[in-house]
Amino acid sequence: MEKKDLVEGMRLYIYKLRVDGRYSTAKSYQDALNSFMRFCGLEVIPYIYVNKENLRRYQAFLLNKGCTWNTVSTYMRRIRCVYNMAVEEGLAPYIPYLFKGVFTGIESKRKKALPQDLLRSLMTASFDDPELRKTRQALCLMFQFCGMAFVDFAHLKKENVRGGVLEYKRQKTG
């Protein structure tokens, strides 16, 4: 498979990600590709179609469809990655600041922390239901483990404690 256009370039990169076992990342690239193809209305997208004006129009298209700024950013960064690889290989023209006019940052409006009084009441609450007590204990442990992700907590085993020290590998990053 050649990378003669953006679609082929992205499909090849998605294939490599899957071979490397990076399935979530591959899905993210596939979602970006599907979205950009819908926007373009094309099955083959020449690299020259990726220009400042079309990227601005694509951003407006995504926002009009109700996508969040973080989705816009993710899709733009996925397209930029593959486009930059094509530039390095001489398959796409180098355009200075090509992605400057579109959002590629991270927007965080939502607060992710519990207020201290709510956390304290959850950690000290008394529950009659044994399942709720177990859940509260898990919450307390995850908090005491400095905000350990639930997926990491769920994969813990007795063998993870060595010499009084908890050792584990992150599920997300290995």
Which residue ranges define each predicted feature?
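N-terminal DNA-binding recognition helix of tyrosine site-specific recombinases/integrases
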Residues: 35-36, 64-98, 148
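Surface-exposed alpha-helical interface segments used for non-catalytic interactions
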Residues: 53-56, 77, 120
